[in-house]
Amino acid sequence: MVGAKAGPSPGTSLGLAQQHSGGSSVLVKSPFCQVCCCGPAPCASCCHSRWPSLTASTCSRLFYILLHVGASAICCLLLSRTVVERVWGKTHRIQMPSGLCAHLFGLSDCPVLSGSGAVYRVCAGTATFHLLQAVLLVHLHSPTSPRAQLHNSFWLLKLLFLLGLCAIAFCIPDEHLFPAWHYIGICGGFAFILLQLVLITAFAHSWNKNWQTGAAQDCSWFLAVLLATLGFYSMAGVGAVLLFHYYTHPAGCLLNKMLLSLHLCFCGLISFLSIAPCIRLKQPRSGLLQASVISCYIMYLTFSALSSRPPERVILQGQNHTLCLPGLSKMEPQTPDISLAMLSASIMYACVLFACNEASYLAEVFGPLWIVKVYSYEFQKPSLCFCCPETVEADKGQRGGAARPADQETPPAPPVQVQHLSYNYSAFHFVFFLASLYVMVTLTNWFSYEGAELEKTFIKGSWATFWVKVASCWACVLLYLGLLLAPLCWPPTQKPQPLILRRRRHRIISPDNKYPPV
């Protein structure tokens, strides 16, 4: 074949692209990488010469993350009152042109192109886009399958399809969109919160098991466990002090004080149970590292909840004061704290991206029941990876491959990356479907979506958002307590002592020694 000498190995992403396209290298080297946009070749083939280690699945994951970030940024711009005023010159409610609206719907009441309605429509398009791909990629186990091209290729067509879905959503009138899609978004948002809680507890549990395995063998790993534990407890303690300083006041904020005190008690409870003798009897690897990670996450959820509640107004010395939020303890009107809103939004979106990538990886490693299996995994040797090591996937690939006879002169099996996916494509898109719904309801204040604005979402807050985040914090505590206490309810395992006694009873007696020693 032409170009066979310079052709790449089958294990690279460029080799996969040539396999999909029939082995021709001319197709991959076409100008402007048009095959990456419209054809079956993955985008990794365009930049393989500069980044040889970039695989098709990794490149696709980065592209999907960029698509989700772009869609979320568009939602924030359409929800921002400041952007609407400066770009369109109107205070609110930018509607579709009446002529186009009458031609499409035959109605004078046109859909709104800004505000919560626009956020619902954009997120409806992105959620539908990922849900369709999740359904089409179910039970996909090989990147060489034709269905894998749907995930790794045809980017221009997929972008046009996504824009078409969003355009169709903007053509749906409000009375048909909001009632059904609002409840779908609430259910999807709660499901994504539960998924985040499972992932953070599994992350802490696996990290602790990983490094505790090394601590039992080497003192350097014990030092790493100690430093990481002190670091997370320090962050949790500093966070608690800052929350008491900025979110409480001697004259009010009783709810904030009670909530902070309760959550600090939760942190102390899970720390005590993590090293309790009854817990360590069933879970010898249990320690303070996982409790410190959960305590730090509890403090983050507490900060997120307190920053989402409306301010409290009290009368002190005949003057009206606004309390319980940073920078609102004085009588004078103040500008909103944009830095606090940006910090809260950045942490929230970082958790969203972590959940989307980690869930798809664990689903490929452990299978459909990864939520249960990830807690029972035992590390054979420690590694710097905080979650499950890469050897899990390699072992899985070795078990899945067919055994070859020793005398058969055939080339060795291809690398694991060619045989198996690095993450589950279907789970990846399904988690992004839930993430789109979660971003939608978070930006629009969950239950009170009417009149939602970006400036109010992360600054003024609402009671609905406050109680949702408080409930998610309590659910995290209950999930971790269940993880610690569940092994206590399991029946005790049989010990091998009866087998040893049975061997002693059936000992053979030689003729020279009629009475064996007892």
Curated annotation (Swiss-Prot):
<keyword id="KW-0444">Lipid biosynthesis</keyword>
<feature type="transmembrane region" description="Helical">
    <location>
        <begin position="286"/>
        <end position="306"/>
    </location>
</feature>
<feature type="transmembrane region" description="Helical">
    <location>
        <begin position="259"/>
        <end position="279"/>
    </location>
</feature>
<keyword id="KW-1133">Transmembrane helix</keyword>
<feature type="transmembrane region" description="Helical">
    <location>
        <begin position="470"/>
        <end position="490"/>
    </location>
</feature>
<dbReference type="GO" id="GO:0008654">
    <property type="term" value="P:phospholipid biosynthetic process"/>
</dbReference>
<dbReference type="GO" id="GO:0016020">
    <property type="term" value="C:membrane"/>
</dbReference>
<keyword id="KW-0812">Transmembrane</keyword>
<feature type="transmembrane region" description="Helical">
    <location>
        <begin position="122"/>
        <end position="142"/>
    </location>
</feature>
<feature type="transmembrane region" description="Helical">
    <location>
        <begin position="338"/>
        <end position="357"/>
    </location>
</feature>
<comment type="similarity">
    <text>Belongs to the TDE1 family.</text>
</comment>
<keyword id="KW-0443">Lipid metabolism</keyword>
<feature type="transmembrane region" description="Helical">
    <location>
        <begin position="184"/>
        <end position="204"/>
    </location>
</feature>
<comment type="function">
    <text>Incorporates a polar amino acid serine into membranes and facilitates the synthesis of two serine-derived lipids, phosphatidylserine and sphingolipids.</text>
</comment>
<feature type="transmembrane region" description="Helical">
    <location>
        <begin position="427"/>
        <end position="447"/>
    </location>
</feature>
<keyword id="KW-1208">Phospholipid metabolism</keyword>
<protein>
    <recommendedName>
        <fullName>Serine incorporator 4</fullName>
    </recommendedName>
</protein>
<feature type="transmembrane region" description="Helical">
    <location>
        <begin position="153"/>
        <end position="173"/>
    </location>
</feature>
<dbReference type="InterPro" id="IPR005016">
    <property type="entry name" value="TDE1/TMS"/>
</dbReference>
<feature type="transmembrane region" description="Helical">
    <location>
        <begin position="222"/>
        <end position="242"/>
    </location>
</feature>
<dbReference type="Pfam" id="PF03348">
    <property type="entry name" value="Serinc"/>
</dbReference>
<keyword id="KW-0472">Membrane</keyword>
<feature type="transmembrane region" description="Helical">
    <location>
        <begin position="59"/>
        <end position="79"/>
    </location>
</feature>
<keyword id="KW-0594">Phospholipid biosynthesis</keyword>
